[in-house]
From Swiss-Prot:
KW Transit peptide (keyword) present: no
Reported function: Required for nuclear and mitochondrial iron-sulfur protein biosynthesis.
Localization: Mitochondrion; Nucleus
Source lineage: Eukaryota, Metazoa, Chordata, Craniata, Vertebrata
Any GO CC annotation of this UniProt entry: L-cysteine desulfurase complex
UniProt-listed CDD domains: Complex1_LYR_LYRM4
Annotated organism of origin: Taeniopygia guttata
Coiled-coil intervals, chain numbering: 44-71
Keywords carried by this UniProt record: Coiled coil, Mitochondrion, Nucleus
Single biological process term from Gene Ontology: iron-sulfur cluster assembly
InterPro entries: Complex1_LYR_dom, Complex1_LYR_LYRM4, ISC_assembly_LYR
Annotated metabolic or biological route of this protein: Cofactor biosynthesis; iron-sulfur cluster biosynthesis
Descriptive protein name: LYR motif-containing protein 4
Length: 89
């Protein structure tokens, strides 16, 4: 993988994780983070530039979905779960 391509993948990975942290719901937040990490680990050894480009486009589309869902999540926030409340760690 070219250095610029690697940097682009890392930027996208960090952006996906950052946006996933915005979910107020513990369940959505942990699910999104787990799925992102699993997907990137699964595809880390791919060397085919066409396949990398295809996966990057898919990840960019997923980033847009996560951003949109994060905004909706904040508009209709619910009460925090017991495990999310201070003092319950």
């Amino acid at each position: 993988m070219a250095a610029s391509s690697r940097a682009q993948v890392l930027r996208l990975y960090r952006a996906l994780l950052r946006e996933s942290q915005r979910f107020s719901s513990y369940n959505y937040r942990t699910y999104a983070i787990r799925r992102i990490r699993d997907a990137f680990r699964e595809n880390k050894n791919i060397a085919d530039s066409e396949k990398i480009e295809e996966l990057l486009n898919k990840a960019k589309a997923n980033l847009e979905v996560i951003q949109r869902q994060g905004t909706i999540d904040h508009m209709y926030a619910t009460e925090k779960l017991i495990i999310e409340r201070p003092g319950n760690t």
